[in-house]
């Protein structure tokens, strides 16, 4: 009989930077994994991403924050207001904030090239929702250094728009997998939703799923680990607070 616990304990793990979270996922996220973080506006998705990247910076790891919802400058200010200062790391070249304009057809190629060309250790994509809801335009896909097996059917011309949600998400996930980084992608959810993602697909493609929820009437927040590859974890929602320094489990 295979000793599952022994196999799990030997897996390299990457700390999240969130106090209390690593304790319930056996020390951190599996290295080179993709974790989906879903939740409504104001639940702390971007903050969790800030903490994840700052933990990497402390270890001299190269980090990338790809944003589609907010300009990079606004995110840096938001983080600083929480006591999370990225400016020294930006000056040292340890992290890059990149705003992606989803109105441009080259957004997918630009995203994939950035992820694959710089040997990043940690990557955040905040959020995946706009990409999953727009037509996809694949130009010069053969120039991208990713595993293209089963990515696009052979009978689709390279210049064709493919309004296929699964294709959008598989392209994004394949780029992240090919980079050998540890990554977090976020997804927007309505308040009170029981879904794991807005698109209903990315939770199956990701290695892990963490949900953040709000209860405005009780003035409380929760975090739950719904899925984590090769990890023993509880499904019980954990109470969290957001304070100076970010999210903390209580």
What is each stretch, according to the model?
Residues 1-6, 10-12, 116-118, 122, ...:
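Conserved P-loop NTPase
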Residues 16-28:
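Pre-Walker A adenine-sensing motif
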Residues 35-38:
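Short hydrophobic/aromatic beta-strand immediately N-terminal to the Walker A/P-loop
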Residues 40-106:
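Conserved P-loop
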Residues 62, 94, 119-122, 178-186:
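Loop/turn-to-beta-strand initiation segments
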Residues 100-177:
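Phosphate-binding/switch loop-helix module in NTP-utilizing enzymes
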Residues 177, 182-245:
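Phosphate-binding/switch region of NTP-binding enzymes
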């Amino acid at each position: 009989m295979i000793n599952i616990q022994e196999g799990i304990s030997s897996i390299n793990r990457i700390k999240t930077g969130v106090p209390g979270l690593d304790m319930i996922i056996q020390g951190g996220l599996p290295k080179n994994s993709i974790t989906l973080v879903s939740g409504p506006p104001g639940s702390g998705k971007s903050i969790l991403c800030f903490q994840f990247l700052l933990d990497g910076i402390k270890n001299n790891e190269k980090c990338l924050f790809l944003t589609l919802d907010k300009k990079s400058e606004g995110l840096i200010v938001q983080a600083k207001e929480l006591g999370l200062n990225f400016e020294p790391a930006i000056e040292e070249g340890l992290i890059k904030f990149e705003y992606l304009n989803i109105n441009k057809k080259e957004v997918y190629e630009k995203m994939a090239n950035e992820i694959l060309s710089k040997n990043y250790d940690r990557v955040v994509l905040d959020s995946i929702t706009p990409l999953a809801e727009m037509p996809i335009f694949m130009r010069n896909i053969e120039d991208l250094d990713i595993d293209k097996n089963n990515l696009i059917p052979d009978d689709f011309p390279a210049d064709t728009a493919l309004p296929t949600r699964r294709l959008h998400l598989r392209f994004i996930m394949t780029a992240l997998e090919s980079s050998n980084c540890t990554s977090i992608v976020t997804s927007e959810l309505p308040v009170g939703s029981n879904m794991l993602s807005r698109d209903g697909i990315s939770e199956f493609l990701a290695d892990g799923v963490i949900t953040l929820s709000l209860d405005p009437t009780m003035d409380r927040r929760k975090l739950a680990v719904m899925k984590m590859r090769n990890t023993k974890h509880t499904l019980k929602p954990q109470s969290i607070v957001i304070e100076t320094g970010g999210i903390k489990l209580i």
